[in-house]
UniProtKB/Swiss-Prot annotation:
It is a peripheral membrane protein. The gene is ecfA. The keyword Signal does not apply. Belongs to the ABC transporter superfamily. Energy-coupling factor EcfA family. One of its GO terms (cellular component) is ATP-binding cassette (ABC) transporter complex. Pfam families: ABC_tran. Forms a stable energy-coupling factor (ECF) transporter complex composed of 2 membrane-embedded substrate-binding proteins (S component), 2 ATP-binding proteins (A component) and 2 transmembrane proteins (T component). Residues 4-238 form the ABC transporter domain. This is Energy-coupling factor transporter ATP-binding protein EcfA. The keyword Hydrolase does not apply. It comes from Methanoculleus marisnigri (strain ATCC 35101 / DSM 1498 / JR1). InterPro entries: AAA+_ATPase, ABC_transporter-like_ATP-bd, ABC_transporter-like_CS, ABC_transpr_CbiO/EcfA_su, Co_trans_ATP-bd, ECF_ABC_transporter_ATP-bd, P-loop_NTPase.
Amino acid sequence: MHLLETRDLTHIYRGDVHALEGVNFTAERKSRIAVIGPNGAGKSTLFKHFNGILKPTSGEVLVRGEPITKENVREVRKFVGIVFQNPDDQIFSPTVEQDIAFGPINLGLDEATVAHRVEEALHLLGIEELRERVPHHLSGGEKKRVAIAGILAMEPQVLVLDEPTAGLDPQGVADLVAFVNRLPEEYGMTVVFSTHHLDLVAEMADYIYVMDKGRVVGSGTVEEVFTRPELLTQTRLDVPPIPKLIRSLRENGVAIDMAYTYEDAKKSFLDAYARRA
């Protein structure tokens, strides 16, 4: 049984706009999944089906093997938490602390449990000093962390992040990557995210879905997807700089191991240098 699954999922908006066409997707426990594709590929629409924000035109969405229904959608939203690309879409309380508490309160939790979850979320995102601040006076990166904290306080098993690095400075991106990579092992969570920053995908994901025009046009491990440049080119994407550079070196006769992350690339270059010395 998959933790999260879609079967032949199709969504048509008013005006006969086909946003999703026969999408099949699965997510397992403690996995990190990237969904990549150009603007308009259907990534955000797909994500909104994961916890019942949108209903399929046809096909189905299964959470822990059960279809999402009117009767169980509240439980589904405890299990699958979504952070939208624009944090202003989900931040609305007078203070950061109140905003993070909103979700747990609406789950019907007692005051002590709510307070504990808020403290945990503030600590996990490193935003304890923001607790009394007005959310709409925060920077874009701070708002993003508050939005994530608000979802984490509900303790979902699946965290869905729509373009989580959008609007973040380099340090904010590095912090987010480190944070996402902690969640599966330390908290047993599954993370599904979309991004246009393909250089980050190998740092953050175990598996990739490639979307274009509402369809899944390819999927596989980081290695399987990034060794198919034609797949990325046809979807107006490009192979990230690290594997592109190493592939070029290999094609020019340099004996160097393929790598996809910064740390692996550093090791490959040092090993190649040692062999030539």
